[in-house]
Every structure is written in C-alpha cells, then in structure tokens.
Amino acid sequence: MKRFLSLFLSLILVVLFTVSFSQEIPTKIYNPKIQKVSQPLYVAIIWHNHQPLYYDPDQNINILPWVRMHAIKDYYDMAYILKNYPQVKANFNMVPSLLYQLELYTKKGIKDKYLILAEKPAEELTLEDKEFILRRFFDVNWDRIIKKFPRYWELLNKRGQSIDDVVIAKAIQNFTVQDFRDLQVWFNLAWFDPDFQEHDKELANLIKKGRNFTEEDKKLVIKKQYEIMSKIIPLYVELQKNKQIEVTTTHSFTLLCLFL
C-alpha cells in the first residue's frame, strides 16, 4: 500500500510540474492560426472511507469486524503516508458511521463477535466457537495475503478450501488447541498493513515466529490494533488543521462526493 500510494503521489507531482511549465502547443493540424495555451491541471484526490453501521444495540456488539480490520490495514496508514508529502493535498470522505464505530471500539469498549472469539482462550472454545472460527477466520484474500504466511496457508489447507458442513465438522476434529490459537492470531495479524508488519518490532517478531503462539502473543496483537485505532481520528484532525486535507462526509455511504 505504501509503495503504491508513494508512486501515485509522485506521478501526480510529475504531471502537475510538466503541465504547469509546458510551452504553448501549436495545433497546425486543425488550424495554423489557433494555438492552445497550456493551463494548470487541477487534480482532486479523493479517498472514500466508509463502513456501514455494524453496531447492534440489542447485543451491544459490532456484528462484523471490518471497521477494526480496515483501521489497521488502511485508514491510519494512508493518512500517515500523505503526511510525509506535505505539498500534496487530498480529500477524505470519512463517513460518521465509520468514525462512530471507531469511537465505540476505543472509547466505549464495544467489541465485535470476531474479536470476542479471538480473545477467548483457545482451550475454552466451544464447538459453536470453533465452527465460527473455522468458517470466518480465513476472511482475507487467500492469494495475496494468506499465501504469504506459511502457517496461515497451512491452516487453511488443513481446514479445506470449502465451508461445507462436512468439511467444517472434520476440521473441528482435526484441529488441535494450538491450531485454533494460531488461527486466532493469524487472522488478526495478517490484516495489519505491511508497514506495521515490517517496521513494528513486536509484530515483526510474531510474524517471524510464525506458529506456536501463546495467549500473551494474542493479547499483544489485539493491543496493537487498539493502539492504531485510537490514533486514526487525531491524525485526520491534525492534517485538517494543517490544511493538508479536507474532509467530506455523509452519514453512512454515498457516491455523490465522488461525482462532485
């Protein structure tokens, strides 16, 4: 993500520089008396960050984990990368339903079902817990992410690349307590942006370790997730105050801002 965004921003700067300083271009093919006068090219960079409202007030939990997962994968890192290019301005569409759920995690102590089961000690998992984990803790791109991590890929193949009831029932019997604990860790560890995986020493050490994780390892991964989530809103506020970004928003999801 960092390499892609850096390359994209560099390309924008090159285009702006080239267009701004280009000479007048004659258009003799159409009319030798008419010349095109080059004008600055104005480019609006808009990052659309949204999440539906997953919060269920009846259960007092977030039903799905995608606010948390994209927080550690995209929302912080994209703004942090932009901060390193102060001459580049951008717009971020941060919908209130996303900001609200970030605060549910960081200030209200609300969790999602995936997080609750990830935090649960592996030896205490029920059959229902194990079934859910085996079905849902591989919900990340298999080719680009899971395959990068040998143990995670091993666990996927041990489960089977299907969520058929027969396959899951067999996997429940075949998975050891350690297998379930490693899966709990890997699902949460693999979602981190590669910058965190490479440059955060504690996360890098866990990735290097690869298997036989402990409950303490799992707690560390979750702690890191909360640290990142708690920094997201302050970072965007800082960039907005410095006039490097503008924030556009609607409550939940919109395409209108992309058309303006």
Placement of each model-derived feature along the sequence:
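Short, well-ordered beta-to-alpha junction loops that form the rim of enzyme active sites
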Residues: 94-97, 251-253
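Bacterial N-terminal signal peptides
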Residues: 8-16
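Sec-dependent signal peptide cleavage junction
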Residues: 18-29
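Short, glycine/serine-rich, charged loops/turns that create anion-binding
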Residues: 12, 50, 252
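Positively charged n-region of N-terminal signal peptides that target proteins for export
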Residues: 1-4
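Structured, charged N-terminal subsegments at the starts of enzyme catalytic cores
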Residues: 223-254
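N-terminal regions that are enriched for targeting/export leaders
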Residues: 30-90, 97-220, 241
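Alpha-helical scaffold elements lining the catalytic groove of polysaccharide deacetylases
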Residues: 256-260
